């Protein structure tokens, strides 16, 4: 099963910069168990609209069956890990 973490961000978003190191650590520690797709909402407004992103940062964990979890605002590593496990990573 493919597990994806979509990271909706903007270059001007301070909290997004706070979230980045957490996601980088997760990627390193979890290796190939999931993939991260970074979505710059200023450049990819259609994707942001499709996922109804209204605040930043927004993280969406999904698998082949659809969206498993959505987080708005800076999210703790443990919460993201729980969602990744629930999604099958």
Each model region followed by its residue ranges:
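Short pre-active-site segment immediately N-terminal to redox-active cysteine/selenocysteine motifs
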Residues: 9-12, 55
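Structural microenvironment flanking redox-active thiols in thiol-disulfide oxidoreductases
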Residues: 41-47
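Structural micro-motif
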Residues: 52-60
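Typically the conserved alpha-helix immediately C-terminal to a functionally engaged Cys/Sec
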Residues: 17-30
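Non-catalytic, surface beta->alpha helical segment in thiol-disulfide oxidoreductase systems
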Residues: 60-89
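The canonical Cys-X-X-Cys-His
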Residues: 13-16, 59
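Hydrophobic/aromatic anchor residues within beta-strands of the central parallel beta-sheet
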Residues: 34-36
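Short active-site neighborhood of thiol/selenol oxidoreductases, capturing the structured segment around
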Residues: 1-9
């Amino acid at each position: 099963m493919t597990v994806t973490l979509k990271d909706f961000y903007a270059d001007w978003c301070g909290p997004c910069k706070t979230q980045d190191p957490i996601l980088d650590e997760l990627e390193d520690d979890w290796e190939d168990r999931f993939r991260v797709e970074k979505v710059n909402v200023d450049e990819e407004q259609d994707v942001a609209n499709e996922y109804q992103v209204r605040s930043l940062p927004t993280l969406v964990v999904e698998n082949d069956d659809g969206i498993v979890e959505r987080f708005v605002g800076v999210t703790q590593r443990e919460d993201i890990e729980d969602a990744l496990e629930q999604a099958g990573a």
